UniProtKB/Swiss-Prot annotation:
Species of origin: Caldicellulosiruptor saccharolyticus (strain ATCC 43494 / DSM 8903 / Tp8T 6331)
Subcellular location field: Cytoplasm
PANTHER family from the UniProt entry: L-AMINOADIPATE-SEMIALDEHYDE DEHYDROGENASE-PHOSPHOPANTETHEINYL TRANSFERASE, PHOSPHOPANTETHEINE TRANSFERASE
Pfam families: ACPS
Name of the molecule in the record: Holo-[acyl-carrier-protein] synthase
Annotated catalysed reactions: apo-[ACP] + CoA = holo-[ACP] + adenosine 3',5'-bisphosphate + H(+)
Major localization listed first in the record, in broad terms: cytoplasm
Length: 123
């Protein structure tokens, strides 16, 4: 059963203009995410897509952002599809709300990245 849906869209240009870019990356992304971003040569579409995904997941949990960005980790499954792994406060919130799965989709094109997250719980 669908608990909630979160959607986020970001302009890629916003990430090109970030001052202290390295600090931003370390503050927002987990070590595994940074490794993936590095493997993509710090592609701005990838960075924007992952950021939008984290925002969409937070919205799907309908709590506002009451946890750190690193509490949400975007991973890839064996087919290259995005999946979500939660830690710390975000994981606790899901357990309290009885959310069993978060389905995630990320898309981007030239100037924007968008993500949609669907939080599911058992009926």
């Amino acid at each position: 059963m669908i608990f909630n849906i979160g959607i986020d869209i970001v302009e890629v240009e916003r990430f090109k203009n970030i001052k202290r870019f390295d600090s931003f990356l370390k503050r927002v992304f987990t070590q595994k995410e940074l490794e993936y971003i590095r493997s993509k040569n710090f592609n701005m579409l990838t960075i924007a897509g992952y950021f939008a995904a984290k925002e969409a997941v937070a919205k799907a949990l309908s709590t506002g952002i009451v946890f750190g960005f690193k509490d949400i980790e975007i991973q890839k499954d064996t087919n290259g599809c995005p999946k979500v792994k939660l830690y710390n406060r975000a994981k606790e919130i899901c357990e309290n709300l009885k959310i069993t799965n978060i389905v995630l989709s990320i898309s981007h094109q030239n100037s924007v990245a968008v993500a949609c997250a669907i939080a599911e719980k058992e009926e």
